[in-house]
């Protein structure tokens, strides 16, 4: 069964890097080895790797509502659109004995009328995730192209539960709240995150804090809008009784990406188009991604908020040659984020104290614990 219904839980994500080519050149792009047309995944390669994944998923311990997700990735996956259609039709004909879904992550500029017509015909089986980096000025600054090239209203109409991904760069940070609020009031679901690979400074952290405060106030004053990332993050990891915090994503365990030639890698930040062919195999072959101790160094292990810290292991290796070596210029950005969001969640749930369910009460308790830990925390390094 193929379904995007929220009644099912995705427990494994298999991404297909179906092309290294892209029609844009975003300011924060991590794919430094793009080849513009030379490397495309073939239908035979896609079938081979997916059949292997299907056979594996059949044998996994799972609940009846546990789902496998197949994601089309790039580059810009719409530059190999024919493969997307071929893979979908092939998989649909297999009548697999477990739930699954498809997802395409795209910049949206190549969603032609004919492509949209096809996606609409299979919209209950596909989730479309489009990158929009805020308002028109923010999007143009990051991506060098107008938002008018993206059929946003059409996407919202046909995929009301899909979301737009906003990446915040140094250039767009001062307009962050404006971008989120503008898109939200238009009826768009927007998740946001800081760009990786950037040297942030104290002024950036102060700006980020003020922008987060504006968004928090907007959500509290406008309860009709759904809370989105990062404001919906959970603080339950504070309850974990462990000396080594669990890694903050499913890299190499719950996620896997197959490059155009069918070779597998831990995630899309560990593929040759990011690091180059020789460099990436060295780390992939030597790291045990199931061992959390391999993902953090002694410096970060001593940090009082390491259970809440989020890092990108692929970027750590790309920028500093070590998956354990985190971007310390981002620490104050993350601290600002955690301080504002824990405080926000306490206020948010207290506004609804008469109608909280058990899950909400648990989230409120976790947010209170986080607030107590974080509100007086400071980092004394630049």
State where each predicted segment sits.
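Exposed loop/turn and edge beta-strand positions of beta-sandwich/beta-sheet ligand-binding modules
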Residues: 12, 66-68, 252, 299
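N-terminal [4Fe-4S]-dependent radical SAM core
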Residues: 1-15, 60-65
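Conserved, mostly hydrophobic/aromatic
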Residues: 22, 26, 72, 104, ...
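Cysteine-centered iron-sulfur cluster-binding motifs in ferredoxin-type domains/subunits
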Residues: 18-25, 76, 252, 300-302, ...
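Canonical Radical SAM [4Fe-4S] cluster-binding loop centered on the CxxxCxxC motif
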Residues: 6-45
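Radical SAM/AdoMet-radical enzyme domain recognition
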Residues: 50-73, 80-199
């Amino acid at each position: 069964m193929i379904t995007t219904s929220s009644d099912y839980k995705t427990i494994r994500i298999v991404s297909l890097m179906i092309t290294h080519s892209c029609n844009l050149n975003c300011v924060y792009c991590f794919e430094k080895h793009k080849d513009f047309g030379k490397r495309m995944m073939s239908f035979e390669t896609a079938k081979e790797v997916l059949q292997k994944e299907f056979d594996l998923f059949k044998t996994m311990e799972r609940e009846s509502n546990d789902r496998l997700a197949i994601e089309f990735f790039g580059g810009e996956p719409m530059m190999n659109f024919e493969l997307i259609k071929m893979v979908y039709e092939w998989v649909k004909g297999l009548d697999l004995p477990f739930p699954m879904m498809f997802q395409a992550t795209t910049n949206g500029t190549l969603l032609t009328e004919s492509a949209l017509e096809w996606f609409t015909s299979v919209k209950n089986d596909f989730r479309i995730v489009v990158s929009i980096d805020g308002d028109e000025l923010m999007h143009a600054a990051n991506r060098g192209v107008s938002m008018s090239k993206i059929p946003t209203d059409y996407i919202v109409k046909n995929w009301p539960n899909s979301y737009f991904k906003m990446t915040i760069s140094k250039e767009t940070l001062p307009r962050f709240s404006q971008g989120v609020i503008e898109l939200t009031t238009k009826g768009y679901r927007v998740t946001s995150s800081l760009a990786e690979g950037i040297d942030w400074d104290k002024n950036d952290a102060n700006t980020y804090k003020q922008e987060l405060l504006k968004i928090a106030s907007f959500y509290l004053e406008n309860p009709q809008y759904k809370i989105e990332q990062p404001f919906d993050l959970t603080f339950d990891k504070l309850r974990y009784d462990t000396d080594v915090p669990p890694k903050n994503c499913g890299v190499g365990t719950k996620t896997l990406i197959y490059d155009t030639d069918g070779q597998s890698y831990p995630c899309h930040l560990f593929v040759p188009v990011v690091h180059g062919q020789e460099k990436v195999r060295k780390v992939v072959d030597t790291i045990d991604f199931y061992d959390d101790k391999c993902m953090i160094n002694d410096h970060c292990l001593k940090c009082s908020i390491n259970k809440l810290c989020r890092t990108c292991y692929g970027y750590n290796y790309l920028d500093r040659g070590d998956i354990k070596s985190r971007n310390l210029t981002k620490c104050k950005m993350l601290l600002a984020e955690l301080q504002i969001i824990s405080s926000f969640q306490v206020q948010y749930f207290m506004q609804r104290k008469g109608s909280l369910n058990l899950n909400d009460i648990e989230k409120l308790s976790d947010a209170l614990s986080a607030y107590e830990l974080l509100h007086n925390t400071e980092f004394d390094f630049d």
